[in-house]
Amino acid sequence: MPKPRSDRNHIIYEIVTPVGSYIGVTAKTQTTVLKSLRARAAKHYYRARTETKTWALCQYLRTLEDKSEIDIRMHEMVRGKADAHARERELIRRYNPALNTDKRGA
């Protein structure tokens, strides 16, 4: 019997704002893609509110009244963490989103 897969699906997503966009990657940890994306958006929102990061995304999220105002969209699903992060870097290089301030590997 073959060994079960140990890698998981990852979602490459985009947060769209009036001041630009942000491209990121997250593991599909919930039962649906939408639930996983909402959980990731909530985590971004929480960190922006509780930490003092000066990242462009955090600064934008601090202007929102509620996490439900975050417009998060799926770009694609990728199997495996390494492949997902490599694809995220490709998309960041291609689109140069304004809110991605960490350009390592881009």
Please describe what each predicted stretch is.
Residues 95-106:
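Coupling/hinge elements of helicase-like and P-loop NTPase modules
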Residues 91:
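Serine endopeptidase catalytic core focused on the charge-relay Asp
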Residues 27-81:
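Conserved short loop/helix modules at catalytic or binding sites
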Residues 7-10, 51, 75, 105-106:
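Small/flexible residues
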Residues 1-36, 71, 79-82, 86:
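GIY-YIG nuclease catalytic motif and its immediate N-terminal context
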Residues 13, 22, 45-46, 60, ...:
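Sequence-level detector for tyrosine residue identity
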